[in-house]
From Swiss-Prot:
<comment type="function">
    <text>Structural component of the proximal-half of the long-tail fiber. The long-tail fibers of T4 are about 1600 Angstroms long with a kink in the middle that divides the fiber into proximal and distal halves.</text>
</comment>
<keyword id="KW-1230">Viral tail fiber protein</keyword>
<comment type="similarity">
    <text>Belongs to the tevenvirinae long-tail fiber proximal subunit protein family.</text>
</comment>
<dbReference type="Pfam" id="PF21446">
    <property type="entry name" value="Gp34_trimer"/>
</dbReference>
<keyword id="KW-0946">Virion</keyword>
<keyword id="KW-0426">Late protein</keyword>
<protein>
    <recommendedName>
        <fullName>Long-tail fiber proximal subunit</fullName>
    </recommendedName>
</protein>
<keyword id="KW-1227">Viral tail protein</keyword>
<comment type="subunit">
    <text>The long-tail fibers are trimeric, with a stoichiometry of gp34/gp37/gp36/gp35 of 3:3:3:1.</text>
</comment>
<dbReference type="Pfam" id="PF21560">
    <property type="entry name" value="Gp34_2nd"/>
</dbReference>
<dbReference type="InterPro" id="IPR048391">
    <property type="entry name" value="Gp34_dom"/>
</dbReference>
<dbReference type="GO" id="GO:0098024">
    <property type="term" value="C:virus tail, fiber"/>
</dbReference>
<dbReference type="InterPro" id="IPR048390">
    <property type="entry name" value="Gp34_trimer"/>
</dbReference>
Length: 1289
């Protein structure tokens, strides 16, 4: 039986209930009648991945490196490593079909080249019965879809355009664009890919036929308008851009006309417009009205003429224009409301006509923060800060009474309301008008009269509308030949001496003339004195006549004409009662004494007379010298006779300051000065004792206090107080003994606590002490004590010796999963891993283990039940028996089967060689085969009415034996008479638990195939539905021509490495999600890489985005709420590198290597210098220093590209410097770097053509008004043709 083959064949097929089944083994390709199994079918009739172990026929197609290859010749088995020389690559590109005119029925999968240049209209009709995933591509190759119609019609399913609208037809309007139609969800989804959008330069030379999506650049090569004709066909929303390259459009204009009368431009019914602005703009097609709507990017405010009532728009400039002077008219201008704060309006009223009134009116809830009066040359006292601002509802201007202004108003809002404030007010300035009294009353400007005009007298017809300034008025002085002004002479100028050089251009008033009296040195007016005035002798301003002089006789009461007393025989009186003679005769009153007579008049004890002054020695001694008995003491000598310790004399009373000083020994103190010497902090003296009330008041600084009053003050408990809630308690007084105590703090009482000791802090029992951070940190947690504890480091955790540190989850995970020293060994308990593969077992099912036992791991691994059973499968069960086939056990020949007779064998018959039968093999019982069973033709299992099956027993639980028996059953229920008779014939494969799969032909003739579990095929071709109730596992790729539909929220999971990826649709959003590391089949982690809103289609990138190539945003713009970082590529030729399509755009590069940044400009060291005039320091630019920096590029095209280079000096005193340069497209090179100045890096004088502030040299300098040097101002003096020097504080 050992020779029995594992494969068996049948000439006509196996008997399987009347139906043929395929061979078990692979078919022979040379035998035409040989059946095939699934393996052969997949091997020979599908496109598979290249297999180096098999052979291939000529033209057999395989997949290698994601490409299709066909064998050039037969390749024998094994084919070996892939050799491209033995294979021919197959084409996978689309077969493009060119359509130039007429109608065309599109088919799914077609790629159409649309030739619009042929000049014909083309209509494409979409398929009527597409399936999901069908694709059609249309590519314009003619470039004229806007002129020649390209219409795509959907007869059944609608087309979804770029706005999400479902339509039945669309136009291809963009030149060289590609239109992709994908059938999905019962709709044709349309995508338009435009050709690279480039500028189209249009000149006046020819009329340009525009197309949708054109970017037209106007360039005026001649002084003529540019003509542009709009396309014949356009889709709703199509745009054509216009740019004025050389800004000449305002001079030569652009004329835009529609293709025909079916469309309009700017306004319905308008077929031609002329543009005269220079700013960019675009035309957008409105299909609803067949109208090209215009957006003009020109933001310049242009004047709007207003002749009737009008509503003013924000940021608008208007002008009120009157019809004529005979029409009385009131125009109301309504200001807008609820607009943006800061919006302005400008209203010009300088073209109002006579009789015209303009009312500028705010909305009902708004106010105008001014009035007409404040806008018409107000007085200083009529507006703040002298007065309050006013608000009005409207401003009314009349052309006849007001000075019509140009008024600019700005809109603001605050907590008080909404206002229009006057940003600028320019009233019309009139010239003065002397026509009549009414015109003379109006304010106006006036020219200044020249000096010659100002000097004209009234009879010479002077000018009426010129103003005389104080200067010209002051210069119109009176002369002998003209009237004018003259200065009144001052008293000083009039009352000069006779010899003075008097002025001839000033006048003397009667008062000044009357004041010029005659004196000894000047001529003047004077009165004649009366006799009384003469006798009085006190008036020095009147004159005396001879008569008056003669009448003035001298007397005791009047000086006058007198006679001298005689000097001969003069004798003094002998006693005081008597008279002497001559000069001694005191009764004579009409004589005058001459000096000689006076010298005779000496005083004696009995006679009055002249005395001689005593000398100092006589005064001090108290005795006259001999012969000078008439000596007398003068105040001077008397003053020298001062009182000392040794003599009597005069003594001076001390002043109060001298008394207060207390150092003078020669002066006397009076009671008053003694009383006024009051004691102060710096002066000893007398003082009054304060009363108790005065002492308690504490404001008197001039009195003294006694000890009793001080004690009385400080011995009172009223002097102190505390806040009981703060835990303060007081006792005693400030005089006797004052005690201030702080209560101990508790849960209800504020107070003070002492600092706990380390022992007390560790004990944790006291509730009336406080713990400092040091004590808290010193209270360490141990096995016997609670306290603070430090988290152990990873190395401390691995060491495992610390008893006072805590293990974090992170370090616990480390020692449990990664630390080898914590693994379990034969000596210690510890962490283990589960073993797998060669770590558990190395061997086979013949000899068992083939590896030395000592080479297996002894430590850190545990064997799982799976691994245990896998290894035990290679060994006999414990109670199994093995037979020794080499022994006969002493049997004789009679006990053996003979070949020549029929025998019945009672025992078991075992054949070790092939058994050949020429007759049928019939068994009334069962048959068992230890090897394969083969039949050359048919293997029939007869059905005698009982169910038939093929059973594969499980065998012993060892080696590769199955755990359950398997059976193949063929049955049906069509004849069973039950309620279900639909299962006509069933081929079922199962085990002891349930069926694995079955194939059944139903009563209606259809075949169904059911798998109760996971399908792991190489390839499956299913022409109908395939229902899998469990899990289907595919060992290779799965390709579907239709959709993969999953009704689970989580679908399409991909697993590789530590992570799983799947797509989740939670009804509101669709997510791209990842699992946690090591949980590839689990739920999602916290990352949200991609989110799609199911309603809007909006995509949210939650975890960052790296774009390796470019990205294009066609509409909607880009909003970034965080930073954008665009890093360029630094190359060695970065300084001179010309931009390319890959490098145009915004990027930034940090340059830190000297080889690169030395090519770029640096920063300038600033050198401190001193101003030679002011002595103050100032900074001046010094040498250039190269430094690292950042190069940033801006611009979207080569026409708008520029770079900024900003240096970042490495020293703190240096300043950052910014440079910039532009790409010169016409020169194909960068311009030179130029420096950008700012507040931190101002330009030097030489940078702007100015002079430095110190040591400047120039050829000449003209100053119009004045020159100032420090506090000195040098002002020109045109009258004297020189300069004046003025000191300015």
């Amino acid at each position: 039986m050992a020779e029995i083959k594992r494969e068996f064949r049948a000439e006509d097929g196996l008997d399987a209930g009347g139906d043929k089944i395929i061979n078990v083994a692979l078919a022979d390709r040379t035998v035409g009648t040989d059946g095939v199994n699934v393996d052969y079918l997949i091997q020979e009739n599908t496109v598979q991945q290249y297999d180096p172990t098999r052979g291939y026929l000529k033209d057999f197609v395989i997949i290698y490196d994601n490409r299709f290859w066909a064998a050039i010749n037969d390749i024998p088995k094994p084919a070996g490593a892939f050799n491209s020389g033995r294979w021919r690559a197959l084409r996978t590109d689309a077969n493009w079909i060119t359509v130039s005119s007429g109608s065309y029925q599109l088919k799914s999968g077609e790629a159409i080249s649309v030739n619009t240049a042929a000049g014909n209209d083309i209509t494409f009709t979409l398929p009527s019965s597409p399936i999901d995933g069908d694709t059609i591509v249309l590519q314009d190759i003619g470039g004229k879809p806007g002129v020649n119609q390209v219409l795509i019609v959907a007869p059944v399913q609608s087309i979804v355009n770029f706005r999400g609208e479902q339509v039945r037809s669309v136009l291809m309007t963009h030149p060289k664009s590609q239109l992709v139609l994908i059938f999905s969800n019962r709709l044709w989804q349309m995508y338009v890919a435009d050709y690279s959008r480039e500028a189209i330069v249009v000149t006046p030379a020819n009329t340009y036929q525009a197309q949708s999506n054109d970017f037209i650049v106007r360039r005026f090569t001649s002084a003529a308008p540019i003509n542009v004709k709009l396309p014949r066909f356009a889709n709703h929303g199509d745009i054509i851009n216009f740019v004025d390259l050389d800004k000449l459009n305002p001079l030569y204009h652009t004329i835009v006309t529609t293709y025909d009368e079916t469309t309009s431009v700017q306004e319905v019914g308008t077929h031609s417009i002329e543009g005269r602005t220079s700013i960019d703009g675009f035309l957008m097609f409105d299909d609803n009205e067949k109208l090209w709507r215009l957006f003009d990017g020109d933001s310049k405010a242009r004047l709007r003429i207003i002749t009737t009532n009008s509503n003013i728009r924000p940021n608008e400039e208007v002008m009120v224009f009157g019809a004529n002077n005979g029409t009385t008219q009131t125009i109301e201008l309504k200001l807008p409301t609820n607009i943006s704060v800061g919006d302005t309006v400008k209203i010009s009223m300088n073209y109002m006509r006579k009789g015209q009134t303009v009312k500028i009116k705010a909305a009902d809830e708004d106010k105008i923060a001014s009035s007409v009066q404040l806008l018409q040359f107000p007085k200083r006292s009529e507006y703040p800060p002298e007065a309050e601002w006013v608000t009005v509802q409207e401003l009314v201007f009349n052309d006849e009474t007001n000075y019509v202004p140009v008024l600019e108003l700005a809109y603001i809002e605050d907590s008080d309301g909404k206002y229009w404030v006057v940003q600028q007010n320019v009233p019309t300035v009139e010239r003065v008008d002397s026509l009549n009294d009414s015109t003379r009353a109006r304010l106006g400007v006036i020219a200044l009269a020249t000096q010659a005009q100002a000097n004209v007298d009234l009879e010479n017809s002077p000018q009426k509308e010129l103003a005389i300034t104080p200067e010209t008025l002051a210069n119109r002085t009176a002369t002998e030949t003209r009237r004018g002004i003259a200065r009144i002479a001052t008293t000083a100028q009039v009352n000069q001496n006779t010899t003075f050089s008097f002025a001839d251009d000033i006048i003397i008033t009667p008062k000044k003339l009357n004041e010029r009296t005659a004196t000894e040195t000047r001529r003047g007016v004077a009165e004649i004195a009366t006799q009384q005035e003469t006798n009085a002798g006190t008036d020095d301003t009147t004159i005396i006549t001879p008569k008056k002089l003669q009448a003035r006789q001298g007397s005791e009461s009047l000086s006058g004409i007198v006679t001298f007393v005689s000097t001969a025989g003069a004798t003094p009186a002998s006693s005081r009662e008597l008279n002497g003679t001559n000069v001694y005769n005191k009764n004579t009153d009409n004589l005058v004494v001459s000096p000689k007579a006076l010298d005779q008049y000496k005083a004696t004890p009995t006679q009055q007379g002249a005395v001689i002054l005593a000398v100092e020695s006589e005064v001090i001694a108290g005795q006259s010298q001999q012969g000078w008995a008439n000596a007398v003491v003068t105040p001077e000598t008397l003053h020298k006779k001062t009182s000392t310790d040794g003599r009597i004399g005069l003594i001076e009373i001390a002043t109060q300051s001298e008394v207060n000083t207390g150092t003078d020994y020669t002066r006397a103190v009076t009671p008053k000065t003694l009383n006024d010497r009051r004691a102060t902090e710096s002066l000893s003296g007398i003082a009054e004792i304060a009363t108790q009330v005065e002492f308690d008041a504490g404001v008197d600084d001039t009195r003294i206090s006694t000890p009793l009053k001080i004690k009385t003050r400080f011995n009172s408990t009223d002097r102190t107080s505390v806040v009981a809630l703060s835990g303060l308690v007081e006792s005693g007084t400030l005089w006797d003994h004052y005690t201030l105590n702080i209560l101990e703090a508790n849960e209800t009482q504020r107070g003070t606590l002492r600092v706990a000791t380390q022992v007390e802090a560790a004990a944790g029992t006291l509730d009336n002490v406080l713990i400092t951070p040091k004590k808290l940190l010193g209270t360490k947690s141990t096995e016997a004590q609670e306290g603070v504890i430090k988290v152990a480091t990873q190395s401390e955790t691995v060491t495992g010796t610390s008893a006072n540190t805590a293990v974090s989850p992170k370090n616990l995970k480390w020692i449990a999963q990664s630390e080898p020293t914590w693994a379990a060994t034969t000596a210690i308990r510890g962490f283990v891993k589960t073993s797998s593969g060669s770590i558990t077992f190395v061997g086979n099912d013949t000899v068992g283990s083939t590896q030395d036992l000592e080479l297996y791991e002894k430590n850190s691994y545990a064997v799982s039940p799976y691994e245990l059973n896998r290894v035990l499968a290679n060994y006999l069960p414990l109670k199994a028996k093995a037979a020794d086939t080499n022994l006969l056990d002493g049997l004789d020949s009679s006990q053996f089967i003979r070949r020549d007779i029929a025998q019945t064998v009672n025992g078991s018959l075992t054949l070790t060689q092939q058994t050949n039968l020429s007759a049928p093999l019939v068994s009334s019982s069962t048959g068992e085969f230890g090897g394969s069973l083969a039949a050359n033709r048919t293997f029939t299992i007869r059905n005698t009415g009982a169910p038939t099956s093929i059973v594969f027993e499980k065998g012993p639980a060892s080696g590769a034996n199955p755990a359950q028996s398997m059976s193949i059953r063929v049955w049906g229920n069509q004849f069973g008479g039950g309620s279900d008779t639909t299962r006509s014939t069933v081929f079922e494969v199962g085990d002891d638990t349930s069926h694995h799969f079955y194939s059944q032909r139903n009563k209606d003739g259809n075949i169904a195939f059911n798998i109760n579990g996971t399908v792991m095929p190489i390839n499956i071709n299913a022409s109908g539905l395939m229902n899998v109730n469990g899990t289907a596992t595919f060992g290779r790729s799965v390709t579907a021509n239709g959709e993969f539909i999953s009704k689970s929220a989580n679908a399409f999971r991909a697993i590789n490495g530590d992570y799983g990826f799947f797509i989740r649709n939670d009804a509101s959003n669709t997510y791209f999600l990842l699992t946690a590391a090591g949980d590839q089949t689990g739920g999602f982690n916290g990352l949200r890489p991609l989110l799609i809103n199911n309603q809007s289609g909006q995509i949210t990138i939650g975890e960052g985005l790296i774009i390796a190539k470019g990205v294009t945003i066609n509409s909607g713009g880009l909003t970034v709420n965080s930073r954008i970082r665009s890093q360029g590529t630094k190359t060695s030729d970065l300084y001179t590198r010309a931009p390319t399509s890959d490098t145009v755009g915004f990027w930034s590069i940090d340059i830190n290597d000297s080889a690169t940044y030395n090519q770029f400009p640096g920063y300038f060291k600033m050198v401190e210098k001193t101003n030679e005039v002011t002595g103050l320091p100032y900074l001046e630019r010094g040498e250039e220093v190269k430094s690292p920096g950042t190069l940033t590029q801006f611009g979207n095209t080569l026409d708008s590209l520029y770079q900024d280079w900003i240096t970042y000096p490495t020293t703190p005193e240096a300043r950052t410097t910014r440079w910039t340069r532009t790409w010169q497209k016409t020169k194909n090179s960068w311009s030179s770097f130029v420096q950008v100045f700012d507040g931190g890096n101002p330009p030097q004088p030489s940078d702007i053509g100015a002079l430095p502030s110190d040591n400047a040299t120039m050829g000449n300098l003209t100053i119009r008004d004045f020159l100032r040097i420090g506090n000195v101002r040098i002002v020109p003096d045109p009258v004297n043709k020189t300069v004046k020097f003025e000191w300015v504080e």
